[in-house]
């Protein structure tokens, strides 16, 4: 008999060799029906996996991220199966699950069209009804290559040949279709209830511009049609909120072919940016942080010492100065460490909290660039904290509370993920255990719920990631807290303890916005361009009905500016209805309309973007109202 520990801590005994699907049935027939995959000792596996030793088990459904991923991974295979049925000459490349669905890359001597997608989708629906079992099998390297050569699948042959010697080579078969795949997958194609093919794109083989351009088909999959309908509605809403479209319409930023991935901020965009950065500085000063600034370009030797050269080189830009090799910084931490090393520190100085709005450059493939969300140059709102091991819990709790304050201000819900040691990492098992437990204890002490993301930590330490949920249900990873024992070791950082001896500090890397540019993009989409008054580039649009109100309009404008209210005037010879509509399209929070009645009464007619016509009030009353709104940062 073997002992299986369930997620809730319950221990059950079963015969050795039992399949996970049978365990799911014994736990609950309802769970068996919903089950898509499972985690055994943290590793995601098929439900048909047999268990031969004591293990921890979590049954995954569509409510779990890896449950969704597994279902959508199977969706990608069903897409490939449908394409091969309809167009047998097409060659298969790769087809993974992604955050919101899946894709598959194909080589074809024709161009896929939207009409073809409809045919392919209809074929997928047939495959769902056929309810093929997904059967995993393994082959020795030579047999695997032979199988793929017989099927004329050149890309699969290349993938197999690139696998290390001794690597398990596995395939999945569903009906008349077989694909090279590590898995896992759902038990049968009938588990995928609703599929939608979404779009077409080009993609270079292996993401390398030197390789052949393939055709990529994107799709998504759900267990219920109602979930698919909800998702499709979200996509339509997202199109309306696209920050690239709104950024252009609202004159916030632009991106030019002279600098792909390098955004240009316009005056109105700079207002939003400066407000976010000023608020960031104010809150960090209150929380005991000291701001620093470090250079953009630093000697190559620094990046060898930090480990970035070994772990991050392909994402970096380089230059040569005075016959020496330099790198443009992809991260702020090594420069911040040099600031710490510049002085001797006592235990009385700790914790030391150094913050930096530092510009970093990271190479992204051109196909991955996306407005402000994925760029090559951005400002990271970093902070690096240095502390003793005894201070870890208290400092992490303080950071979490600060992050919570920021996200609540902007109206975001969020969830937290604790990411543990990746395969490509530095440091001892003991340090990783202390660091990971430190983060766990901080989260547990304030009752913060979190998920564990095994193996997704930074190469130098475990981390807590904060995922924002926007108003249409999408998630964005922004803030992060990373505990680091490695950098202090590599840079020989120290402080003088109470015993007069040198000790090694613990270092924490931390962001809130993540990337300022990306956060602005998220806010544009969160608010659909209609920023709250305190953040709006233009807070008031002042407009006259005829030229006779011009002098009064200028007095009102002056009074607003004296009170630091951002105002624009519209004195064009246009109908007032046209001016109002334009201001509404520009998402201005308030419009003040001045006619002869307002001039005579010394009032302003107020129209709110949110509440419509508010009637005529005194200018003083309006100024007091809007100043309170700005001061309280009302959403």
Curated annotation (Swiss-Prot):
Residues 242-532 are annotated as: Catalytic. GO terms for biological process: threonyl-tRNA aminoacylation. Its EC number is 6.1.1.3. Zn(2+) binds at residues 333, 384, 509. It catalyses: tRNA(Thr) + L-threonine + ATP = L-threonyl-tRNA(Thr) + AMP + diphosphate + H(+). Signal peptide: none annotated. InterPro entries: aa-tRNA-synt_IIb, aa-tRNA-synth_II, aa-tRNA-synth_II/BPL/LPL, Anticodon-bd, Anticodon-bd_dom_sf, Beta-grasp_dom_sf, TGS, TGS-like. Its cofactor is Zn(2+). SMART domains: tRNA_SAD. One of its GO terms (molecular function) is catalytic activity, acting on a protein. One of its GO terms (cellular component) is cytoplasm. Residues 1-61 form the TGS domain. Binds 1 zinc ion per subunit. Gene3D superfamilies: 3.10.20.30, 3.30.54.20, Anticodon-binding domain (3.40.50.800), Bira Bifunctional Protein, Domain 2 (3.30.930.10), Threonyl-trna Synthetase, Chain A, domain 2 (3.30.980.10). The keyword DNA-binding does not apply. Keywords: Aminoacyl-tRNA synthetase, ATP-binding, Cytoplasm, Ligase, Metal-binding, Nucleotide-binding, Protein biosynthesis, RNA-binding, tRNA-binding, Zinc. SUPFAM superfamilies: Class II aaRS ABD-related, Class II aaRS and biotin synthetases, TGS-like, ThrRS/AlaRS common domain. It is found in: Cytoplasm. It holds the Pfam family HGTP_anticodon. The keyword Zinc applies. Belongs to the class-II aminoacyl-tRNA synthetase family. Catalyzes the attachment of threonine to tRNA(Thr) in a two-step reaction: L-threonine is first activated by ATP to form Thr-AMP and then transferred to the acceptor end of tRNA(Thr). Also edits incorrectly charged L-seryl-tRNA(Thr). Homodimer. This is Threonine--tRNA ligase. It comes from Clostridium botulinum (strain Kyoto / Type A2).
């Amino acid at each position: 008999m073997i002992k299986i520990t369930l997620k809730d801590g319950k221990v059950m005994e079963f015969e050795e060799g039992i399949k996970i699907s049978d365990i799911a049935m014994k736990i609950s027939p309802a769970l068996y029906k919903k089950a898509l995959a499972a985690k055994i000792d943290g590793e995601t596996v098929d439900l048909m996996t047999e268990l031969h030793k004591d293990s921890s088990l979590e049954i995954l459904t569509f409510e779990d991220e890896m449950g969704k991923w597994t279902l959508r991974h199977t969706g990608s295979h069903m897409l490939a199966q449908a394409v091969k049925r309809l167009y047998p000459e097409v060659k298969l490349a790769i087809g993974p699950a992604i955050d919101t669905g899946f894709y598959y890359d194909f080589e074809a001597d024709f161009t896929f069209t939207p009409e073809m997608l409809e045919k392919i989708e209809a074929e997928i629906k047939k495959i769902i009804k056929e309810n093929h079992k997904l059967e995993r099998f393994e082959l020795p390297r030579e047999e695997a290559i032979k199988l793929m050569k017989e099927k004329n699948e050149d890309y699969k042959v290349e993938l197999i040949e690139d696998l290390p010697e001794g690597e398990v080579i596995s395939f999945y078969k569903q009906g008349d279709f077989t694909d090279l795949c590590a898995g896992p997958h759902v038990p049968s194609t009938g588990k995928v209830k609703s599929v939608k093919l979404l779009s077409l794109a080009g993609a270079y083989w292996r993401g390398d511009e030197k390789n052949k351009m393939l055709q990529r088909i994107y799709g998504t999959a759900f267990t219920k049609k109602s979930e698919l309908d909800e998702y499709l509605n979200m996509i339509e809403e997202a199109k309306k909120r696209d920050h690239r479209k709104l950024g252009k319409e609202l004159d916030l930023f632009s991106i030019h072919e002279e600098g792909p991935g390098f955004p240009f901020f316009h005056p109105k965009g700079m207002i939003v940016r400066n407000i976010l950065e000023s608020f960031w500085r104010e809150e960090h000063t209150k929380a005991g942080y000291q701001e620093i600034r470090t250079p953009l370009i630093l000697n190559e030797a620094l990046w060898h010492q930090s480990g970035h050269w070994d772990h991050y080189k392909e994402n970096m830009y380089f230059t040569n100065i005075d016959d020496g090799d330099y790198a443009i910084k992809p991260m702020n931490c090594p420069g911040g460490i040099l600031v710490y090393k510049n002085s001797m520190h006592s235990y009385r100085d700790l914790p030391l909290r150094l913050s930096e709005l530092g510009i970093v450059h990271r190479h992204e493939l051109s196909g991955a660039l996306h407005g402000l969300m994925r760029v090559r140059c951005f400002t990271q709102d970093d902070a690096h904290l240095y502390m003793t091991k005894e201070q870890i819990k208290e400092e992490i709790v303080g950071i979490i509370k600060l992050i919570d304050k920021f996200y609540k201000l902007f109206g975001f819900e969020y969830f937290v993920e604790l990411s543990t040691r990746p395969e490509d990492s530095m440091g001892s098992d003991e340090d990783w255990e202390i660091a990971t437990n430190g983060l766990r204890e901080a989260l547990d002490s304030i009752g913060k719920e979190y998920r564990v993301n095994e193996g997704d930590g930074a190469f130098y330490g475990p981390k807590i990631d904060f995922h924002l949920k926007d108003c249409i249900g999408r998630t964005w990873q922004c803030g992060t807290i990373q505990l680091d024992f490695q950098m202090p070791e590599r840079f020989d950082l120290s402080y003088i303890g109470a015993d007069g001896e040198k000790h090694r500090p613990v270092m924490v890397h931390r962001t809130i916005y993540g990337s300022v540019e990306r956060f602005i993009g998220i806010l544009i989409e969160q608010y659909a361009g209609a920023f709250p008054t305190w953040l709006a580039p233009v807070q008031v649009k002042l407009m006259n009905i005829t030229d006779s109100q011009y002098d009064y309009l200028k007095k009102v404008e002056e009074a607003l500016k004296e009170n630091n209210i951002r105002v624009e005037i519209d004195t064009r010879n246009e109908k007032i209805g046209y001016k109002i509509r334009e201001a509404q399209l520009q998402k201005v929070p308030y419009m003040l309309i001045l006619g002869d009645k307002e001039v005579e009464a010394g009032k302003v007619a107020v129209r709110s973007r949110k509440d419509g016509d508010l009637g005529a009030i005194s200018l003083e009353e309006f100024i007091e109202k809007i100043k309170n709104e700005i001061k309280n940062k009302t959403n």
